[in-house]
Amino acid sequence: KNNLTAGGKTYRPVSLWINWPVTDNSKQHLILGGGEKFLHPNVDPSLLSGIMLNPMQQSEPSKIALFSAAQYAWKQWKSEEEAKKVNDIAFNFVETGKFTDSETSVAFRELGKHMINQNMDGRVVKLEESVELAPKLAAFMSKLKAGQDVNAERQELRAEFAKLKAAAQLYKASGDEKMRAQIHYWLDNAIDQMDALSAFLDGSEAIENNDSARLWDSYYKGLKLYEQSQTYTFLYVDHDERAELGVQHIRPFLLGLREVLATE
């Protein structure tokens, strides 16, 4: 406002064009959160005349962001925490048209926790994903590389990966038909990545037990499953892209664990 009224000019409310949740700069991903970093709390609404979002190529998952923008325009949130709660409710409304949880909306939201980050450089707003899982991944890897006992951490990660796989399988089988038609590539990628991680965790256990045969079998199985996870391609305007889930923390953890097993 100060810039636009310099020299005594009259202020006219502006319309905002927000480059979110567009994935033109990170084509292999979906962005299913992060609105709190663009639609800021406690903004003077009299300064704005409108908000326009730049959506993803995929219209159905773009509805998560559209729900947040509609809520923001109707009743502006007061904190980032409130904005995140709105984003959580969006999965319910987009899935069933209701604000309450359903089995499939909960599964979709669980997957959405790992489809937020743009995986880009400092030119764009950094969006954090896998917020709850990331510290667990880091703790396991740190202890594993230090040669410490990771049995408890391994069991916890097995449960986390099994939960994500189950969510992807459930949504693939029973989720909203129009949504599934646009995101099944990421569901398949998630299932294969979780299976690959399970195999690599088996390999980490084999290292502790000095079981070279099981180590090799687990490593090879995980390697093939990861390679398979990279085969789910979709048309992006005029070329094919590979769908990827968990680009910020899950995939780097998988690749790091693969290297640990490979060196053994």
What label would you give each PLM region?
Residues K1-E264:
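Substrate-binding groove of N-acetylhexosamine-processing glycoside hydrolases
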